[in-house]
């Protein structure tokens, strides 16, 4: 027997059950949708996040650059991050900084009007920390090799 389900149910289930954070913000950068993955990643419930500015998760020192890019995308309707993953720092409710990667989907009304952007995100903090440690180890080994090769 073939299971019956609607396209709408399938899409809703994927967004609700994925471990990835899925956030939709309107043209002004106000959060309008926040899934369970976003709750787990950032520590805010949907009730706390919806209606707030994206500043909620953007570290203060990165906000000017963030808003410059966001406004450009909303004005032009074009983003290069629909095909590429963007890696940026973010901040959790408890103030902890994390590293995230995300892609953007621009959402339009049937009329073609740009409504805002959905971001699909994953926390890559552990991977970034491992890469940093590997780079530090490599630098230390290279320094030792340099010393070994020098005459006494």
Stretch-by-stretch model annotation:
Residues 5-29, 33, 37-39, 82, ...:
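Sensory modules in modular signal-transduction proteins
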Residues 102-104, 121:
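Sensory-domain boundary capping and coupling elements
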Residues 1, 69, 139, 143-152:
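Non-catalytic regulatory/interaction regions at protein termini and inter-domain linkers
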């Amino acid at each position: 027997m073939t299971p019956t389900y609607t396209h709408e149910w399938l899409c809703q289930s994927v967004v609700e059950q994925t471990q990835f954070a899925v956030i939709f913000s309107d043209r002004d950068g106000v959060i309008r949708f926040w899934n369970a993955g976003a709750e787990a990643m950032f520590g805010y419930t949907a009730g706390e996040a919806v209606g707030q500015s994206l500043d909620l998760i953007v570290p203060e020192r990165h906000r000017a650059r963030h808003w410059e890019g966001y406004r450009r995308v909303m004005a032009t309707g074009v983003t290069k991050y629909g095909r590429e993953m963007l890696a940026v720092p973010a901040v959790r409710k408890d103030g902890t900084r994390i590293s995230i990667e995300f892609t953007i989907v621009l959402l339009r009304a049937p009329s073609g009007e740009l409504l805002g952007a959905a971001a699909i995100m994953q926390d890559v903090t552990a991977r970034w920390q491992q890469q940093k440690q590997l780079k530090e180890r490599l630098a230390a080994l290279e320094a030792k090799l340099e010393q070994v090769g020098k005459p006494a």
